Amino acid sequence: MLLNCIIFSAILKFKTNRNKRILKFLLLKCSLAILLPIGISFIILNNVSYSGESVNVIALQPNIDPYSEKYNMTNLKFVDLLEKLTYNKITDSTDFLITPETYFAESVRLPKFRTSQLRTRLDAIVGKHPNLNIITGVSFLDVFRDKNRAGPESNQYDAVTWYNDYNSAVLINKTDNIAQYNKSKLVVGIENFPYQSVLKPILGDALIDLGGTVAMKTTQDYRGIFTSSNGNYKAAPIICYESVYGEFVTGYVRNDANFLTIITNDAWWNETQGHQQHLSYAKLRAIETRRDIARSSASAWPPGCTSLRTRSPTWRSRLTA
């Protein structure tokens, strides 16, 4: 806006006076307006001192092709992969292990998760490292036959059966409580299908799937926080598309999140610029909230400033700590 005003004012003066000095002053003013803020920003960046308690995080980057691999593996196979990638990497000082969105994509019946083999396997990992907190993406289904339970975000399976489809993040640690957060900013047309009765017969499943099954997802109306087993850390479980919205992410901070996590399936973008732009949004959220971000995806971790402390190569299986 400032540059626009300077240029507009200079053009008006030049048209009146036809004095080339005006153009020289315009060039000088524009250069100062651009370079001065950049210079000040670099000075501030080089003098930033990080304070507060540090958190030891491992972010998983499994490099799973969502088009050919993700839905052809069972949840227990993904636990095997998790154990393989984290073997000898998790220590007693590791606070969090973070996996991508819907890492466990084989839908789990919500009431049965507590007693499932998946929960048992994850508990076993935590049992070896009592200080560990696992934040992972899980696809949940809650199936019911009570029509009165069906809400505007419920899906009807047949004449007597409905289900809620959740794209969730869960926290597993040494406490018996399981914290669950359901993705609440949905991809329109994929996870949030408006006017289904009209559009579904026309479009069918022609829309690309960016985060699980093409069905209406069930959301929640508050920004849940995951508290570590020792009570020192309060993580914001931001799921994929939610990180695009600054005010939405600020809601986690208002609920006392002292660091942010982003779990995402941005491999859906393949070789396009989509996953790069998604990563750039994460950096903006770090600047806005003054919070460090641990990001589990194809692109790894942007911190609470303008540069990446640690970044994994895209399309490689690895861990970032």
Positions of PLM-derived features:
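Soluble catalytic regions of membrane-associated enzymes that act on cell-envelope
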Residues: 42-190, 227-232, 237, 241, ...
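Membrane-interfacial interhelical loops
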Residues: 1, 56, 318-321
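Cytosolic-side transmembrane helix boundary signature
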Residues: 2-28
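Short, solvent-exposed cationic patches
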Residues: 196-213
